[in-house]
Amino acid sequence: MGEWTILERLLEAAVQQHSTMIGRILLTVVVIFRILIVAIVGETVYDDEQTMFVCNTLQPGCNQACYDRAFPISHIRYWVFQIIMVCTPSLCFITYSVHQSAKQRERRYSTVFLALDRDPPESMGGPGGTGGGGSGGGKREDKKLQNAIVNGVLQNTENTSKETEPDCLEVKELTPHPSGLRTASRSKLRRQEGISRFYIIQVVFRNALEIGFLVGQYFLYGFSVPGLYECDRYPCIKEVECYVSRPTEKTVFLVFMFAVSGICVVLNLAELNHLGWRKIKLAVRGAQAKRKSVYEIRNKDLPRVSVPNFGRTQSSDSAYV
Protein backbone atom coordinates (compact mmCIF):
# COMPACT_ATOMS: atom_id res chain seq x y z
CA MET A 1 0.00 0.00 0.00
CA GLY A 2 2.96 2.32 0.56
CA GLU A 3 3.89 2.20 -3.13
CA TRP A 4 0.38 3.28 -4.11
CA THR A 5 0.59 6.20 -1.64
CA ILE A 6 3.77 7.44 -3.31
CA LEU A 7 2.10 7.24 -6.72
CA GLU A 8 -0.93 9.17 -5.42
CA ARG A 9 1.29 11.97 -4.10
CA LEU A 10 3.16 12.23 -7.38
CA LEU A 11 -0.10 12.48 -9.31
CA GLU A 12 -1.40 15.14 -6.94
CA ALA A 13 1.82 17.11 -7.49
CA ALA A 14 1.20 16.98 -11.23
CA VAL A 15 -2.38 18.20 -10.90
CA GLN A 16 -2.03 21.04 -8.40
CA GLN A 17 -0.41 23.62 -10.70
CA HIS A 18 -1.02 22.81 -14.35
CA SER A 19 -4.12 20.62 -14.66
CA THR A 20 -7.61 21.77 -15.54
CA MET A 21 -10.72 21.03 -13.50
CA ILE A 22 -11.44 18.00 -15.66
CA GLY A 23 -7.91 16.76 -15.02
CA ARG A 24 -8.50 16.98 -11.28
CA ILE A 25 -11.73 15.01 -11.61
CA LEU A 26 -9.81 12.43 -13.62
CA LEU A 27 -7.21 12.20 -10.86
CA THR A 28 -9.98 11.52 -8.34
CA VAL A 29 -11.35 8.75 -10.54
CA VAL A 30 -7.90 7.20 -10.97
CA VAL A 31 -6.96 7.41 -7.29
CA ILE A 32 -10.27 6.34 -5.72
CA PHE A 33 -11.85 3.99 -8.25
CA ARG A 34 -8.66 2.36 -9.46
CA ILE A 35 -5.73 2.50 -7.09
CA LEU A 36 -7.65 2.12 -3.84
CA ILE A 37 -10.05 -0.54 -5.10
CA VAL A 38 -7.33 -2.58 -6.80
CA ALA A 39 -5.05 -2.30 -3.77
CA ILE A 40 -7.68 -3.06 -1.12
CA VAL A 41 -10.50 -5.06 -2.71
CA GLY A 42 -8.67 -6.72 -5.59
CA GLU A 43 -6.14 -8.52 -3.42
CA THR A 44 -8.86 -10.20 -1.36
CA VAL A 45 -10.99 -11.15 -4.36
CA TYR A 46 -8.15 -12.61 -6.44
CA ASP A 47 -5.98 -13.96 -3.62
CA ASP A 48 -6.98 -17.62 -4.15
CA GLU A 49 -7.56 -17.33 -7.88
CA GLN A 50 -5.17 -20.09 -8.96
CA THR A 51 -5.46 -22.36 -5.94
CA MET A 52 -9.27 -22.52 -6.22
CA PHE A 53 -9.21 -23.14 -9.96
CA VAL A 54 -10.00 -26.88 -9.86
CA CYS A 55 -10.45 -29.28 -12.78
CA ASN A 56 -12.09 -32.73 -12.56
CA THR A 57 -8.93 -34.62 -13.43
CA LEU A 58 -5.86 -35.98 -11.69
CA GLN A 59 -3.60 -35.59 -14.71
CA PRO A 60 -0.42 -33.78 -13.57
CA GLY A 61 -0.10 -30.31 -15.08
CA CYS A 62 -3.65 -30.21 -16.44
CA ASN A 63 -4.89 -27.67 -13.88
CA GLN A 64 -2.00 -25.29 -14.58
CA ALA A 65 -2.39 -25.59 -18.35
CA CYS A 66 -6.13 -24.93 -18.21
CA TYR A 67 -5.65 -21.97 -15.86
CA ASP A 68 -3.13 -20.46 -18.26
CA ARG A 69 -5.61 -21.00 -21.08
CA ALA A 70 -8.50 -19.41 -19.19
CA PHE A 71 -6.52 -16.44 -17.80
CA PRO A 72 -3.43 -15.59 -19.89
CA ILE A 73 -2.76 -12.80 -17.40
CA SER A 74 -4.47 -12.37 -14.06
CA HIS A 75 -7.09 -9.64 -13.80
CA ILE A 76 -5.39 -7.95 -10.89
CA ARG A 77 -1.96 -7.96 -12.55
CA TYR A 78 -3.44 -6.61 -15.76
CA TRP A 79 -5.05 -3.71 -13.91
CA VAL A 80 -1.88 -2.95 -11.96
CA PHE A 81 0.06 -2.84 -15.23
CA GLN A 82 -2.66 -0.62 -16.71
CA ILE A 83 -2.46 1.85 -13.80
CA ILE A 84 1.32 2.08 -14.09
CA MET A 85 1.29 2.61 -17.85
CA VAL A 86 -1.57 5.14 -17.78
CA CYS A 87 0.14 7.16 -15.04
CA THR A 88 3.51 7.18 -16.85
CA PRO A 89 2.69 10.21 -19.10
CA SER A 90 1.66 12.21 -16.01
CA LEU A 91 4.90 11.27 -14.26
CA CYS A 92 6.87 12.36 -17.34
CA PHE A 93 5.00 15.67 -17.25
CA ILE A 94 5.94 16.10 -13.58
CA THR A 95 9.61 15.58 -14.44
CA TYR A 96 9.45 18.06 -17.30
CA SER A 97 7.62 20.77 -15.34
CA VAL A 98 9.93 20.44 -12.32
CA HIS A 99 12.96 20.67 -14.61
CA GLN A 100 11.61 23.79 -16.31
CA SER A 101 10.78 25.40 -12.96
CA ALA A 102 14.30 24.70 -11.69
CA LYS A 103 15.81 26.22 -14.84
CA GLN A 104 13.61 29.30 -14.50
CA ARG A 105 14.59 29.68 -10.84
CA GLU A 106 18.29 29.41 -11.62
CA ARG A 107 17.93 31.95 -14.44
CA ARG A 108 16.11 34.37 -12.13
CA TYR A 109 18.72 34.02 -9.40
CA SER A 110 21.57 34.55 -11.84
CA THR A 111 19.87 37.73 -13.11
CA VAL A 112 19.46 39.06 -9.56
CA PHE A 113 23.07 38.28 -8.68
CA LEU A 114 24.33 40.06 -11.78
CA ALA A 115 22.20 43.09 -10.93
CA LEU A 116 23.48 43.21 -7.35
CA ASP A 117 27.10 42.64 -8.27
CA ARG A 118 29.13 45.79 -7.50
CA ASP A 119 32.82 46.60 -7.21
CA PRO A 120 34.16 47.28 -3.68
CA PRO A 121 34.51 50.96 -2.77
CA GLU A 122 37.85 52.56 -3.49
CA SER A 123 40.08 53.51 -0.59
CA MET A 124 39.56 56.99 0.75
CA GLY A 125 43.16 57.51 1.82
CA GLY A 126 45.08 57.80 -1.44
CA PRO A 127 47.68 60.32 -2.39
CA GLY A 128 45.02 62.97 -2.74
CA GLY A 129 43.39 62.00 0.55
CA THR A 130 43.39 64.01 3.69
CA GLY A 131 46.37 64.10 5.96
CA GLY A 132 48.76 61.20 6.28
CA GLY A 133 46.26 58.42 6.88
CA GLY A 134 47.53 56.45 3.92
CA SER A 135 46.03 53.10 3.20
CA GLY A 136 45.21 52.49 6.86
CA GLY A 137 43.04 55.59 7.02
CA GLY A 138 41.35 54.57 3.78
CA LYS A 139 40.50 51.15 5.19
CA ARG A 140 39.04 52.74 8.32
CA GLU A 141 36.94 55.07 6.19
CA ASP A 142 35.82 52.09 4.10
CA LYS A 143 34.69 50.27 7.20
CA LYS A 144 32.68 53.28 8.29
CA LEU A 145 31.10 53.66 4.87
CA GLN A 146 30.23 50.04 4.26
CA ASN A 147 26.92 49.71 2.46
CA ALA A 148 24.44 46.85 2.24
CA ILE A 149 21.99 46.08 -0.51
CA VAL A 150 18.66 44.93 0.88
CA ASN A 151 15.88 44.05 -1.56
CA GLY A 152 17.61 45.93 -4.32
CA VAL A 153 18.03 49.16 -2.22
CA LEU A 154 21.42 50.58 -1.32
CA GLN A 155 21.42 51.31 2.42
CA ASN A 156 23.92 52.36 5.06
CA THR A 157 24.99 50.11 7.92
CA GLU A 158 24.51 50.99 11.55
CA ASN A 159 28.17 52.00 11.94
CA THR A 160 27.75 54.90 9.50
CA SER A 161 26.73 58.21 11.01
CA LYS A 162 25.44 61.33 9.39
CA GLU A 163 28.73 63.17 9.94
CA THR A 164 30.75 60.59 8.02
CA GLU A 165 28.18 60.15 5.25
CA PRO A 166 29.45 61.80 2.07
CA ASP A 167 27.25 63.98 -0.06
CA CYS A 168 27.66 61.76 -3.09
CA LEU A 169 26.15 58.74 -1.34
CA GLU A 170 22.51 58.42 -2.31
CA VAL A 171 19.92 55.76 -1.70
CA LYS A 172 19.06 54.33 -5.11
CA GLU A 173 16.79 51.50 -6.09
CA LEU A 174 18.05 49.04 -8.65
CA THR A 175 15.72 49.22 -11.61
CA PRO A 176 15.91 46.41 -14.13
CA HIS A 177 16.83 47.22 -17.68
CA PRO A 178 13.92 47.23 -20.15
CA SER A 179 15.71 44.74 -22.39
CA GLY A 180 16.16 42.44 -19.41
CA LEU A 181 12.45 42.65 -18.66
CA ARG A 182 11.60 41.80 -22.25
CA THR A 183 14.01 38.87 -22.23
CA ALA A 184 12.63 37.56 -18.93
CA SER A 185 9.01 37.87 -20.08
CA ARG A 186 9.86 36.22 -23.39
CA SER A 187 11.60 33.30 -21.67
CA LYS A 188 8.71 32.92 -19.22
CA LEU A 189 6.19 32.90 -22.08
CA ARG A 190 8.28 30.33 -23.95
CA ARG A 191 8.46 28.16 -20.84
CA GLN A 192 4.68 28.33 -20.33
CA GLU A 193 4.07 27.42 -23.97
CA GLY A 194 6.40 24.43 -23.63
CA ILE A 195 4.65 23.22 -20.47
CA SER A 196 1.21 23.63 -22.08
CA ARG A 197 2.31 21.75 -25.19
CA PHE A 198 3.79 18.93 -23.11
CA TYR A 199 0.60 18.74 -21.03
CA ILE A 200 -1.51 18.33 -24.17
CA ILE A 201 0.86 15.63 -25.45
CA GLN A 202 0.64 13.66 -22.21
CA VAL A 203 -3.17 13.86 -22.25
CA VAL A 204 -3.20 12.46 -25.81
CA PHE A 205 -0.83 9.62 -24.89
CA ARG A 206 -2.79 8.85 -21.74
CA ASN A 207 -6.02 8.60 -23.70
CA ALA A 208 -4.38 6.34 -26.30
CA LEU A 209 -3.17 4.03 -23.52
CA GLU A 210 -6.63 3.99 -21.94
CA ILE A 211 -8.24 2.96 -25.23
CA GLY A 212 -5.56 0.33 -25.86
CA PHE A 213 -5.98 -1.29 -22.45
CA LEU A 214 -9.77 -1.13 -22.76
CA VAL A 215 -9.66 -3.01 -26.07
CA GLY A 216 -7.12 -5.50 -24.70
CA GLN A 217 -9.28 -6.22 -21.67
CA TYR A 218 -12.25 -6.94 -23.92
CA PHE A 219 -10.33 -9.39 -26.11
CA LEU A 220 -8.74 -11.14 -23.12
CA TYR A 221 -11.72 -11.53 -20.78
CA GLY A 222 -14.89 -10.21 -22.39
CA PHE A 223 -17.59 -8.85 -20.08
CA SER A 224 -18.09 -11.87 -17.81
CA VAL A 225 -16.17 -14.54 -15.93
CA PRO A 226 -17.72 -18.01 -16.50
CA GLY A 227 -18.14 -20.30 -13.53
CA LEU A 228 -17.45 -23.41 -15.65
CA TYR A 229 -14.59 -23.57 -18.12
CA GLU A 230 -14.06 -26.49 -20.50
CA CYS A 231 -10.48 -27.23 -21.47
CA ASP A 232 -8.80 -29.79 -23.70
CA ARG A 233 -5.29 -28.38 -23.66
CA TYR A 234 -2.22 -30.60 -23.40
CA PRO A 235 -1.33 -32.41 -21.09
CA CYS A 236 -5.02 -33.07 -20.44
CA ILE A 237 -5.95 -36.47 -21.89
CA LYS A 238 -9.51 -35.45 -22.74
CA GLU A 239 -11.74 -32.42 -22.40
CA VAL A 240 -12.08 -31.58 -18.72
CA GLU A 241 -14.31 -29.21 -16.79
CA CYS A 242 -12.70 -26.56 -14.59
CA TYR A 243 -14.40 -24.45 -11.96
CA VAL A 244 -13.59 -20.79 -11.22
CA SER A 245 -13.91 -19.44 -7.69
CA ARG A 246 -16.34 -16.53 -7.09
CA PRO A 247 -17.29 -15.98 -10.76
CA THR A 248 -20.15 -13.55 -10.01
CA GLU A 249 -17.99 -11.33 -7.83
CA LYS A 250 -15.24 -11.29 -10.44
CA THR A 251 -17.77 -10.48 -13.16
CA VAL A 252 -18.98 -7.46 -11.19
CA PHE A 253 -15.41 -6.37 -10.63
CA LEU A 254 -14.61 -6.80 -14.33
CA VAL A 255 -17.61 -4.73 -15.46
CA PHE A 256 -16.74 -2.07 -12.89
CA MET A 257 -13.21 -1.72 -14.26
CA PHE A 258 -14.64 -1.52 -17.77
CA ALA A 259 -16.84 1.35 -16.63
CA VAL A 260 -13.93 3.15 -14.95
CA SER A 261 -11.81 2.85 -18.09
CA GLY A 262 -14.68 4.18 -20.20
CA ILE A 263 -15.14 7.14 -17.84
CA CYS A 264 -11.42 7.91 -18.04
CA VAL A 265 -11.55 7.89 -21.85
CA VAL A 266 -14.54 10.26 -21.84
CA LEU A 267 -12.82 12.59 -19.35
CA ASN A 268 -9.65 12.66 -21.44
CA LEU A 269 -11.65 13.58 -24.54
CA ALA A 270 -13.52 16.24 -22.55
CA GLU A 271 -10.23 17.68 -21.32
CA LEU A 272 -8.89 17.84 -24.87
CA ASN A 273 -12.10 19.57 -25.90
CA HIS A 274 -11.71 21.97 -22.98
CA LEU A 275 -8.14 22.76 -23.97
CA GLY A 276 -9.43 23.40 -27.48
CA TRP A 277 -8.87 21.31 -30.57
CA ARG A 278 -8.15 24.49 -32.51
CA LYS A 279 -5.43 25.52 -30.07
CA ILE A 280 -3.96 22.04 -30.25
CA LYS A 281 -3.87 22.18 -34.05
CA LEU A 282 -2.32 25.65 -33.96
CA ALA A 283 0.32 24.48 -31.48
CA VAL A 284 1.19 21.48 -33.65
CA ARG A 285 1.27 23.59 -36.81
CA GLY A 286 3.38 26.23 -35.05
CA ALA A 287 5.93 23.61 -34.04
CA GLN A 288 5.99 22.22 -37.58
CA ALA A 289 6.38 25.70 -39.09
CA LYS A 290 9.22 26.46 -36.71
CA ARG A 291 11.06 23.28 -37.67
CA LYS A 292 10.45 24.03 -41.35
CA SER A 293 11.84 27.56 -41.05
CA VAL A 294 14.94 26.31 -39.27
CA TYR A 295 15.40 23.69 -41.97
CA GLU A 296 15.05 26.29 -44.73
CA ILE A 297 17.55 28.60 -43.07
CA ARG A 298 20.07 25.80 -42.74
CA ASN A 299 19.61 24.67 -46.34
CA LYS A 300 19.57 28.16 -47.84
CA ASP A 301 22.02 28.55 -50.71
CA LEU A 302 25.03 30.56 -49.65
CA PRO A 303 26.38 33.20 -52.08
CA ARG A 304 28.83 31.58 -54.40
CA VAL A 305 32.37 32.91 -54.20
CA SER A 306 34.31 33.05 -57.42
CA VAL A 307 37.45 30.99 -57.06
CA PRO A 308 40.33 31.58 -59.46
CA ASN A 309 40.91 28.69 -61.83
CA PHE A 310 44.28 27.11 -61.27
CA GLY A 311 43.65 24.37 -63.81
CA ARG A 312 46.15 22.76 -66.08
CA THR A 313 47.44 24.49 -69.19
CA GLN A 314 46.84 23.30 -72.71
CA SER A 315 50.08 21.39 -72.78
CA SER A 316 49.45 19.71 -69.44
CA ASP A 317 45.90 18.78 -70.50
CA SER A 318 47.20 17.08 -73.59
CA ALA A 319 49.66 15.14 -71.52
CA TYR A 320 46.79 13.38 -69.69
CA VAL A 321 44.92 12.40 -72.84
UniProtKB/Swiss-Prot annotation:
Biological processes per GO annotation: cell-cell signaling; chemical synaptic transmission; visual perception
Gene3D superfamilies: Gap junction channel protein cysteine-rich domain (1.20.1440.80)
Cell location: Cell membrane; Cell junction, Gap junction
Bilayer topology term: Multi-pass membrane protein
Keyword terms: Cell junction, Cell membrane, Gap junction, Membrane, Transmembrane, Transmembrane helix
MF annotations from Gene Ontology: gap junction channel activity
Parts of the chain that traverse the membrane: 20-42, 76-98, 198-220, 253-275
Extracellular side: 43-75, 221-252
Gly residues compositional bias, start-end: 125-137
Main location group: membrane
Record's GO cellular component terms: connexin complex; synapse
Location of the region described as Disordered in the Swiss-Prot/TrEMBL record: 117-141
Keyword hit for Transmembrane: yes
Entries under Pfam families matching the protein: Connexin
Regions of this protein lying in the Cytoplasmic compartment: 1-19, 99-197, 276-321
Function: One gap junction consists of a cluster of closely packed pairs of transmembrane channels, the connexons, through which materials of low MW diffuse from one cell to a neighboring cell.
Family: Belongs to the connexin family. Delta-type subfamily.
Subunit organization: A connexon is composed of a hexamer of connexins.
Protein name: Gap junction delta-2 protein
Organism of provenance: Bos taurus (Bovine)
